[in-house]
A protein has these predicted regions:
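Conserved switch/coupling elements of ABC/ABC-like ATPase nucleotide-binding domains
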Residues: 209, 213-223
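Conserved ABC ATPase "signature" region
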Residues: 112-130
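H-loop/switch region of ABC-family ATPase nucleotide-binding domains
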Residues: 195-196
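Conserved ABC ATPase signature
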Residues: 134-138
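ABC ATPase nucleotide-binding domains
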Residues: 222, 226-228, 232-248
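The feature captures the beta-strand-to-loop junction immediately N-terminal to the Walker
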Residues: 37-39
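Catalytic Walker B motif of ABC-type/P-loop ATPase nucleotide-binding domains
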Residues: 159-163
Length: 248
């Protein structure tokens, strides 16, 4: 039986004039990919920010451990939806990761030990050839692979991904989801993934949470994708009729 890593109770967040989250209750288990799906404005990114402690909210978020009910040291890896990189910043991928991860000054010569560790992590996402490239010259897909590598370097307990495959081509998406499947299995990692790629969610997610400011439906892919709540949010009018015809 999977172990609960994170439990959210009655999470509510209101911005001026807008309720972004309304009594969200959710449990996240180790070794599973939890996909957050829903329309734009459903509160998915807001929920990620609440978990990260970036925004105040009501309700409780509790990180748990198997021994005493609480984690001695929680490590969270996070990849945002987008990152702004100054075009004139002459920093290589090695410099970026070494300075961020190891506080290693960019003006010092390369450390062979640090370089080996960085290269090893980049290899997980088939990005080792990017180690000497200037960050400002990376494509969107290349940058996302570098950010994903940075997110897992500390071997986190929890990995938060806010639409991490935006800007990545089809081959890159397939590699990403296969890598997530590998990480959750080999590191017993809990992954919370925001995604609009429903085909990939159906293929790789262990647990799906349909968010509509509150949890409209959660469960297995089958339970959520075949629910009336999913139908209401994602299929209306002619699209709904087409879907009904497909299932006859």
């Amino acid at each position: 039986m999977a172990k609960i890593l994170l439990e959210m109770k009655n999470i509510t967040k209101t911005f001026p004039g807008v309720k972004a989250l309304d009594n969200v209750n959710l449990q996240v288990e180790e070794g599973e990919i939890h996909a957050l799906v829903g329309e734009n404005g459903a509160g998915k990114s807001t929920l990620i920010k609440a978990i990260l402690g970036e925004i105040p909210h009501t309700g409780t978020i509790e990180f748990k451990d198997t021994k005493d009910g609480h984690m001695a040291k929680l490590k969270i890896g996070y990849v945002p939806q987008s990152v702004n990189i100054e075009k004139n910043t002459p920093v290589s991928v090695y410099d970026l990761i070494a300075s961020y991860q190891y506080n290693y000054p960019v003006f010092l010569p390369k450390s062979k030990k640090i370089e080996a560790k960085i290269r090893e992590t980049l290899e997980v996402f088939e990005a080792e050839e990017l180690i000497d490239k200037q960050v400002c010259n990376l494509s969107g897909g290349q940058l996302q692979r570098v950010l994903l590598s940075m997110a897992i370097m500390d071997e986190p307990n929890l990995l938060l991904l806010d639409e991490p495959v935006s800007g990545i081509d089809q081959n890159g998406m397939e590699l990403f989801y296969k890598t997530m499947d590998y990480l959750k299995t080999h590191y017993d990692l809990a992954i919370i993934l925001i995604s609009h790629d429903l085909d990939y969610v159906a293929k790789y997610a262990d647990h799906v949470v349909l968010l509509d400011k509150t949890v409209a439906k959660q469960g297995t892919v089958k339970e959520v994708f075949e629910s009336k709540e999913f139908e209401r949010i994602f299929y209306t009018g002619e699209e709904s009729w087409v879907r009904e015809e497909e299932h006859k």
